[in-house]
């Protein structure tokens, strides 16, 4: 037998002790049968106790949830102060469009409009039950994307019953209150304008309501200097309202458009184009039908068919005109602003005066900005009250003349385009006077060159004490260059060229074209009456009228000489 080292004996003893401790610990963790029974009873008791304790708590939580107050509604015009916050808004869906990503609902309340993006998956329509015209309650987070406000939608509920009625009533009350313009004075004392002051207020209300309803406003105006002045005045008033109403930076290009009328009337060609565009926008972008504002157009039979087409689709319509109307045409507009409809026979009133006053009612903030426009709209003999207004605004007579001539020249080129920015620079940027003077100088040079060409070719004839200056526009004008026939005849008549060569106190200028005669007088020559008389005298010429006072007489090319003789005779007898 060997001898055991004391150190080794100590290690072995320690290992033995450790093993015994481990075995005892394992035994402690092995439950006995009695332990199992006791533990089961304890677990069952605990479970029962837990159930009895949980049910009242859950009920209490549910009751608390039910009694929790509803989230407060936020007004849309306050969202700029609540970026990154959770909000609830209520309003009307005024537009819905599907992008390659989310569905974007344009929601309007009584204060403003905002885009709300809802996403289920890329390109898939979210909340298909919600459409334009529905009233909704929407919860989401306000975000700023590309410097524009947008609500990221968490939940959207289409409102029905009392909830819908509450929101609809709230919005309608706000619309009625906000859309009606305040009592605004006219720009100046003018009897003819005062006669239609109520109509101007009504027209302003229609325009303001359209903006608040997110309904596009389309201004269609005659492509003359006067028409441009009136259309630009309305544009100047509406654009700030659109910017205030819509958060998107490009809203002014979607919700307002100004389109010149090349032919001067709102005929079927113009109406067909507009209706095609509006139906396409409604189908593709869920847009509301626009409000059409016809300026220096929409009063004569030439516009009847176009207005009737808009009426079929129930597109709202406003007409603003200073020209003599045909019977019944004004009834096709929701609001017609024309002093002749109220028995005021003022041929010296321009549509620019009406347009500037309408603009001041649509948006009182632009009153000073448009106060010089009435003076700009007169080619000669502008009323003193309007020249005084222009002087007060810093526009002297030379400046207003330059503006008028510059706009007349630009109206001729690209006549179907609105030229928004250029017209704005000319009419409203006072510091850019040199631009107006430069373009106005071009106007005068081109006009004088053409007058030098045509004056030797003017013919003068008389009938029944009336002198006629006749220009064969087919033979002696550059028909496709500036100035157009209308501008040229206006200047010939203002200067009374040829009048000295004929006897008679009455003077009429005629532009004798291939198949029509344009009339310029003191406003007393009604083309419809003249056409009716001339048709009896030249029954094979196919004579008809286009327009009313100082309008045009149309005829067959092969009977142009007979038509001219008949028209001269008819006018002279009427005067």
Name what the model sees in each region.
Residues 84-95, 131-144:
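OB-fold and OB-like beta-barrel modules that bind single-stranded nucleic acids
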Residues 94-122:
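OB-fold (S1/OB) nucleic-acid-binding surfaces
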Residues 36-88, 157, 161:
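OB-fold nucleic-acid-binding modules
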Residues 379-478:
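Hard-cation-handling environments
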Residues 5, 9-10, 14-15, 19-20, ...:
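Intrinsically disordered, low-complexity repeat/linker tracts enriched for polar/charged residues
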Residues 33, 40-41, 55-56, 61-63, ...:
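N-terminal accessory regions of nucleic-acid-interacting proteins
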Residues 100-103, 143-152:
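Short, Lys/Arg- and Gly-enriched loop/turn segments at beta-strand edges
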């Amino acid at each position: 037998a060997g001898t055991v080292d004391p150190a080794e004996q100590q290690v072995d003893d320690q290992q033995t002790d450790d093993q015994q401790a481990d075995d005892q610990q394992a035994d402690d963790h092995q439950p006995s049968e009695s332990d199992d029974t006791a533990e089961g009873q304890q677990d069952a008791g605990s479970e029962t106790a837990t159930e009895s304790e949980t049910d009242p708590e859950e009920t209490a939580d549910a009751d608390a949830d039910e009694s929790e107050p509803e989230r407060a509604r936020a007004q849309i015009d306050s969202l700029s102060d609540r970026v990154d916050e959770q909000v609830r808004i209520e309003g009307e869906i005024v537009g819905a469009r599907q992008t390659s990503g989310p569905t974007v609902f344009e929601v309007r309340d009584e204060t403003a409009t905002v885009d709300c993006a809802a996403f289920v998956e890329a390109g898939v329509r979210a909340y298909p039950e919600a459409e334009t015209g529905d009233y909704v309650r929407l919860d989401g987070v306000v975000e700023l994307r590309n410097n524009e406000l947008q609500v990221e939608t968490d939940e959207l509920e289409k409102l029905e019953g009392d909830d819908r009625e509450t929101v609809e009533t709230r919005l309608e009350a706000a619309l009625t209150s906000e859309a009606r313009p305040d009592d605004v004075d006219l720009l100046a004392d003018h009897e003819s304008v005062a006669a239609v002051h109520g109509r101007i207020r009504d027209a302003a209300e229609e325009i303001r309501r359209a903006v608040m309803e997110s309904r596009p406003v389309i201004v269609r105006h005659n492509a003359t200097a006067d028409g441009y002045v009136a259309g630009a005045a309305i544009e100047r008033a509406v654009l700030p309202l659109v910017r205030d109403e819509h958060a998107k930076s490009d809203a002014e290009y979607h919700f307002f458009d100004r389109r010149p009328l090349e032919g001067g009337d709102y005929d079927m060609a113009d109406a067909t184009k507009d209706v095609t565009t509006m139906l396409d926008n409604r189908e593709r972008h869920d847009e509301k039908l626009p409000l059409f504002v016809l300026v220096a157009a929409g009063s004569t039979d030439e516009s009847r068919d176009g207005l009737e087409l808009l009426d079929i689709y129930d597109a709202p319509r406003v007409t603003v005109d200073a020209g003599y109307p045909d019977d019944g045409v004004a009834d096709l507009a929701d609001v017609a602003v024309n002093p002749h409809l109220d028995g005021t026979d003022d041929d010296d009133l321009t549509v620019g005066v009406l347009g500037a006053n309408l603009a001041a009612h649509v948006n009182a903030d632009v009153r000073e900005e448009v106060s010089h426009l009435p003076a700009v709209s007169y080619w000669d003999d502008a009323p003193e009250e309007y020249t005084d207004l222009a002087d007060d605004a810093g526009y002297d007579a030379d400046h207003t003349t330059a503006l008028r001539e510059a706009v007349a020249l630009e109206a001729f080129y690209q006549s179907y385009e609105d030229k928004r920015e250029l017209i704005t620079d000319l009419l409203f940027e006072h510091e850019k006077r040199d631009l107006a003077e430069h373009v106005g100088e071009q106007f005068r040079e081109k006009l004088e060159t053409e007058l030098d060409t045509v004056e030797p070719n003017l013919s003068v004839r008389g009938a029944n004490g009336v002198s006629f200056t006749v220009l064969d526009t087919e033979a002696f004008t550059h028909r496709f260059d500036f100035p157009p026939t209308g501008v040229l005849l206006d200047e010939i008549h203002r200067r009374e060229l040829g009048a000295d060569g004929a006897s008679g106190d009455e003077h009429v200028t005629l532009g004798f074209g291939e198949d029509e005669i344009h009339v310029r007088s003191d406003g007393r020559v009604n083309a419809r009456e003249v056409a009716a008389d001339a048709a009896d005298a030249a029954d094979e010429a196919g004579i008809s009228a286009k327009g009313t006072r100082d309008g045009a007489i149309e005829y067959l090319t092969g009977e142009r000489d007979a038509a001219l003789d008949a028209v001269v005779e008819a006018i002279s007898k009427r005067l």
